[in-house]
Amino acid sequence: MNMRLLLLLLFGSVVMYTSCQSTSALIDSLAARVTENTSKGQILFRLVTDEADPAKDYFEIDSKDGKVLITGNSDLSLATGLNWYLKYVAGIHLSWNNPSQKLPEVLPLPQKKIRQATAMKNRYYLNYCTYSYSMAFWDWERWEKEIDWMAMHGINMPLSITGMEVVWYNLLKRIGYTTEEINEFISGPAFMAWWQMNNLEGWGGPNPDSWYRQQEALQKKIIARMRELGIEPVFPGYAGMVPRNIGEKLGYQIADPGKWCGFPRPAFLSTEDEHFDSFAAMYYEELEKLYGKAKYYSMDPFHEGGNTEGVDLAKAGTSIMGAMKKANPEAVWVMQAWQANPREAMVNTLDSSDLLVLDLYSEKLPQWGDPESMWYREKGFGKHDWLYCMLLNFGGNVGLHGRMEQLVNGYYNACAHVNGKTLRGVGATPEGIENNPVMFELLYELPWREERFSPDEWLQTYLKARYGNDLSPEVAEAWRALEHTVYNAPKNYQGEGTVESLLCARPGFHLDRTSTWGYAKLF
């Protein structure tokens, strides 16, 4: 054999072996955490590529020498396969209510090889609001559990806004703002979501210096673990937000987006202003110094009714995109489809490969082109890629709620629709989490199930995962009742999330709701 060819083969073998070993160690560690150190020697992981169909992610569950063998094309696929095995072979359901569980001494083996694959390469997670309603004061111990949960559900692009206040702190210091002025702009921890969405400024602050140091260190640990697992964090990009006083203080040309729920919004830096490009560049520089470059940047200019008077939307769109591309030419702009966004005038001139739209409320008010939707857009999102997303939760309110049939049927209808040619995956965009885990299991299995299925049939398999293989008839009957009531909200139900408790309403003699937009009557 040619010596050069022999050396090349040997080198390739070493590289492949090292890659498999490092990946195995990484997923072994995850498996140990979620099984309370009982998976070692019982579950084996193997990373391989599928040369026959490289466009798809996949995993296989099999057995070898009396042990469970999980094969996949990436770390995330292996983690997703682990979760699938635990649910559908071992009868173990890991969720927010039960994030880890010891394995039995003798693990059940699959009766035959299980293989699941998906061409839906994007699986998104989180909403800005989640960071305030559910995550405002999480520490690393809690975040580690959540990242494990993400990996086991195949999530590969979660919104990541922890510690972004440090970016703004450093940026504003750089242009001459005092610490006091900065804290008048940056909101307190419980209101970071609405500050990041350009809805308000300063509310709930000021923040102590220790907060900024703590959140910077926490975010660095979060994104390091995500990137180890092949998860791409979605960072907030620069969409024109500036403090309201920047015109008076520094002479910047700004537009006033008005108020949001009575709160004065931060100003919008005009793209006509000579400072726009330099300010955006400084933002991305400070972001990269702290947390590195991102593949995805989330930006939602004029969120929830922001005033666009005097704004050239087309120029704003190209300027925002241009600033992002200067920071990372390979980056993609992620935008929420919510109410008037995305505005056609802002995105029509953008290249199709540069924007990814989140159809934020696909299970109720889809904008992808469903003619039955109140938010119907005939052309959907046009040439741009998009994700089918489940919103589910509003306000972090806790209660049993879901739209199983609409979620499943809507997804497969979208896949079959002409606008489905640009559908690239799914996402969960809840305002609050740690409730209704059944809906998240259902959502994140959709891309791994190529054929349309019945929610009723799926629920029977889910219940065995949740309660074990010895499912009692009483439990099954109770869940059938839930499936056809609270987990099958009718299309004409206009409430935001779960029905409300009248105990939370203002006193009155004829109450039927707590909020003006909600309902207390169960369907």
Predicted regions and their residues:
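Bacterial Sec-dependent N-terminal signal peptides
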Residues: 1-25
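Active-site-adjacent substrate/metal-binding segments within catalytic domains
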Residues: 120-139, 150
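Second-shell loop/turn segments in exported
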Residues: 67-72, 131-137, 209-210
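Catalytic-core regions of glycoside hydrolase
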Residues: 93, 97-107, 126-130, 151, ...
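Stable alpha-helical elements in mature extracytoplasmic
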Residues: 23-30, 78, 82, 142-146, ...
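Contiguous, structured surface segment used for ligand recognition
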Residues: 20-120
